[in-house]
């Protein structure tokens, strides 16, 4: 199937083989079959979500998707409410109460994407070669679709109820740092038994993520002295030359074995080629695998001093997203998921990755957290973003059984 002929038409799913499965317990096999029979419906849900563009910086667009999702989750018996924001879309919380007591499971994700409004015109949602392509298909509208269908499956198996309390939180600012949603995420996590994050899996084998690096952002500004580069060269103090020396010093702080990396990603400075630059600025990305390394690298950066004493340095920033470390609670949750996957017929692998998510916040609180439970595919944030359709049923089955058992 080359391309959907009409954007709003129902997607016809290419015939692809389901993932090969081993002999599995009867109940797990029946549940997997439930989602295999609904593969087209899951794919159609992803298409609907992808075709409502939701860039982080466009509040009306994000709120349109939030309103649709509130209706979908309420149709499954949830109580939806919005945490209102001015600068970003409203954050959606959905609570599913049951007659059974106990702490809820928190299903965590985001509805914002990195693509600007209008991207669909040149990057339309389509199904081809067993994959669904489109902006946000993998990161993470497939994860949201899996939430919806896993909850639907649980209600089907439990007489239109859920086997335990569940809270869904879909934030609208994850792709831009989660500044407004972090307090909400942490508050809900503290009252939860576990947090299941529906960010994309790692690699085409669908590994879940049991560790993520923490993220920091710093800005280094150098103030020198401007002068004419021909007439008064000796009177000037080049901010760019000083910044270059600082960048060289910063590069020596990298320690790959400890999972500590620093990347100067942006540099600016100067006004004209015949003017010795009075100012120069560098923006720095810092990644730490262990929270205990964060204070040390922060101190080292703030301890930087000018090589040229006639220049001044100004250093701002800090670690804004703690690492998700593979704690005992995280490891236990992975083992539980791995056992479920085994019963469903495949081996679930785990991975440690350099990127951060909102799961970093919840794991840092000591709440058992498992990330990467969303779709399987490639190309997140890129023009070739896609999700693999044949993997959707078993991801939904894994999520449903994990919600039930944690």
Language model regions located:
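Acidic/His- and Gly-rich active-site-bordering loop/insert found
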Residues: 2, 6-7, 17, 21-135, ...
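Metal-dependent amide/peptide-bond hydrolase catalytic core
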Residues: 2-6, 15-30, 37, 54-55, ...
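A structural signal for isolated positions on well-ordered beta-strands in alpha/beta enzyme cores
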Residues: 106, 167-169, 314
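Short beta-strand segments
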Residues: 108-109, 169-171, 196-199, 221-223, ...
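Glycine/serine-rich anion-binding loops at beta->alpha junctions
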Residues: 115, 131-145, 228
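Phosphate-handling active-site elements
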Residues: 118, 128-130, 150-167, 249-259, ...
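Acidic/histidine-rich catalytic neighborhood of metal-dependent amide-processing enzymes
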Residues: 140-211
């Amino acid at each position: 199937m080359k391309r959907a002929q009409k954007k709003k038409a129902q997607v016809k799913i290419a015939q692809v083989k389901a993932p090969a499965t081993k002999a599995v317990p009867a109940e797990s096999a029946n549940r997997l079959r439930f989602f295999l029979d609904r593969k087209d419906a899951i794919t159609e849900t992803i298409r609907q979500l992808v075709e409502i563009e939701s860039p982080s910086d466009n509040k009306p667009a994000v709120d349109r998707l939030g309103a649709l999702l509130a209706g979908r989750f309420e149709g499954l018996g949830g109580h939806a409410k919005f945490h209102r924001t001015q600068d970003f879309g409203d954050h959606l919380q959905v609570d599913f109460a049951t007659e059974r007591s106990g702490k809820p499971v928190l299903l965590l994700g985001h509805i914002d994407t990195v693509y600007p409004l209008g991207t669909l015109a040149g990057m339309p949602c389509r199904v081809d070669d067993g994959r669904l392509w489109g902006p946000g298909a993998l990161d993470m509208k497939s994860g949201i679709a899996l939430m919806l269908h896993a909850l639907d499956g649980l209600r089907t198996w439990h007489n239109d109820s859920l086997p335990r309390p569940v809270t869904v939180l879909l934030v609208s600012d994850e792709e831009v740092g989660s500044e407004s949603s972090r307090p909400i995420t942490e508050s809900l996590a503290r009252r939860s038994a576990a947090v299941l994050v529906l960010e994309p899996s790692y690699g085409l084998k669908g590994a879940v993520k049991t560790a993520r690096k923490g993220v920091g952002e710093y800005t280094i500004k150098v103030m020198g002295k401007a002068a004419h580069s021909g007439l008064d060269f000796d009177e000037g103090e080049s901010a760019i030359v000083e910044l270059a020396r600082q960048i060289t010093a910063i590069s020596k702080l990298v320690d790959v074995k400890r999972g500590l990396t620093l990347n100067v990603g942006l540099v600016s400075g100067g006004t004209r080629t015949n003017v010795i630059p009075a100012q120069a600025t560098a923006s720095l990305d810092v990644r730490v695998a262990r929270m205990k390394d964060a204070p040390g690298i922060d101190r080292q950066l703030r301890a930087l001093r000018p090589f040229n004493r006639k220049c001044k340095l100004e250093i701002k920033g800090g670690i804004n997203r703690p690492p998700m470390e593979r704690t005992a609670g995280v490891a236990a949750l992975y083992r539980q998921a791995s056992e479920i996957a085994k019963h469903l017929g495949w081996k679930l692998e785990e991975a440690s990755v350099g990127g951060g998510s909102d799961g970093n916040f919840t794991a840092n609180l000591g709440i058992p957290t498992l990330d990467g439970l969303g779709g399987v595919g490639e190309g997140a944030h890129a023009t070739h973003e896609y999700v693999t359709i044949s993997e959707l049923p078993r991801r939904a089955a894994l999520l449903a059984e994990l919600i039930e058992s944690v």
